[in-house]
Amino acid sequence: MTETPAASAQTCPHCGALLETDAKFCEACGKAVGAETAAAPAATGEPSPLDDASPISAVTARPGTAAPEAAAGSRAPCLQCGGAVDDDGYCTQCGTKAPDPRDHFEEQPAPWVGGVCDRGIRHHRNEDAMAMAVDGPRVVLVVCDGVSNTVDSHIGSMNAAHAVLDVLRPPLPRGLGVPESRDAAITRLFTDAAAAGQRAIAATVPEDVPNPPSCTLVAAVLDDDVVHFCGIGDSRIYLLPDAGDGQMLTVDDSMAQLLILGGTPRAEAEASKQAHSITKWLGKDSAEIVPRVGQVRVTGPGWLLACSDGLWNYASEPTALMEQITAAGSDDPL
């Protein structure tokens, strides 16, 4: 599902996606490009951190953009000629393929809560999905990463993310009034949420489809000053305080994690060939869908981050993520 761009291929100076010959607009981000612009390096002169699997070495933040109109149920006009775009995604006038609104979308339910979901430049579609909700100071974040070699995982991951959000959106259960009872009730709720995600992704395709869709899951609920979280697969939840050390809250279900448990240094394990092979997932062929569940108390301001390996693959350690946040110099979540 991935490919390595040829050295001579033209790439978008804004997002790094491959460009069609003589393209005037990037099909990935929709921004205008010209013959000179397309061949030129990015304005910063810094190498793109997405060129390889090395850690991020430069700030990658960029101004946020609104979600494409098509994501809300209507198609934007053709970027090449302004003509109408048909349901098949192609312009009815010039035949140019329109950017898929699923390739890049954003959500910001509150000024201090937001998310960006992007197609990786080496993938032909965006298989990540996210869902979030805000109710006063209470926040729910959900991220699902579709498994590339399964059928319709981009659809299944989105279905799963929203099914999980629906379960976690109401106030958390209080149990019988004692901490042990409340913890047990919350663990049960996260298990129910994972089961809802499992049903949603399984319903994406007919029963007889071989290699049905599957995805990872992480979810976090910030309730008062406590973060409750769960995980299946190798998507992650990080707590990154403004002061003090950051934490990776979740534990991956992956071959890399098995190597780490066996004594392999994290950087070496995460760079291994099978690093991103997951050992648990949501999907019809999953043997186990019980998530790892945990909680942590928040002691000061900072960031709660839910992400797929599309982000952490380039900045795995909390310190590397904090360097990016600090260098960006913004409190805008987008």
State where each predicted segment sits:
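PP2C/PPM-type serine/threonine phosphatase catalytic domain
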Residues: 1-334
